[in-house]
Amino acid sequence: ALTVTAQFCGYSYVEPFLKIKAGMPDSMVTWVLVLYGVAGILSSILYTKLYDKHHKPFLYFAVCGIGAALFMLYPASWFIPATIAVCAFWGIAIMTFNLVLQSLVIEVAPPAAVTIAMATYSGIYNLGIGSGAFIGGIVERSIGVQFTTLAGFLVSLIAAAVFFKKLLPNVMG
């Protein structure tokens, strides 16, 4: 839930971030979010073609890509083309995370429990959405929308630390 919390600290406030911090007009924000989604589709294509032979790089990117995007978005926001590039990278990162984590849940769950495991994963994911929006809201109201992505980045550091310390040894056997 921590990586999803990090994601939604930033993503829940991406529209006002892009308008206020990056200075984008409404129409550009719309197209940047379309690009974010299209980039996610690119991630799906790469996943389909490469995941079976390259589990580890996909897993590492799934854990670290969202945090990297959240970190880069703040300084990139001073230059609109850089902001657009980071948003595309972010779309790739979140879709990679979603695909890899769902695959891992299916892979590690006993066949008879896959449905329950996926339902549990969905519940945990939704907890991350809510907690990310909540934390992002606190940040937005207390110090400004421009810091929501950095708050998400800080949460992603905790998520990465937990993953590399506790979860990676279990996933990689």
Show the residue positions of the predicted features.
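Hydrophobic core of transmembrane alpha-helices in multi-pass small-molecule transporters
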Residues: 81-96
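Structural signature of the two symmetry-related core transmembrane helices
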Residues: 57-72, 153
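Short hydrophobic/small-residue motifs within alpha-helical transmembrane segments
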Residues: 34-38, 126-127
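A late C-terminal transmembrane helix in Major Facilitator Superfamily
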Residues: 106-145, 152
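Helix-to-loop junctions at the C-terminal end of transmembrane segments
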Residues: 42-55, 140
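Extracytoplasmic gate region of multi-pass secondary transporters
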Residues: 1-33
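Intracellular juxtamembrane helix-capping segments at the cytosolic ends
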Residues: 96-110
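Multi-pass alpha-helical transporter architecture, strongest
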Residues: 153-173
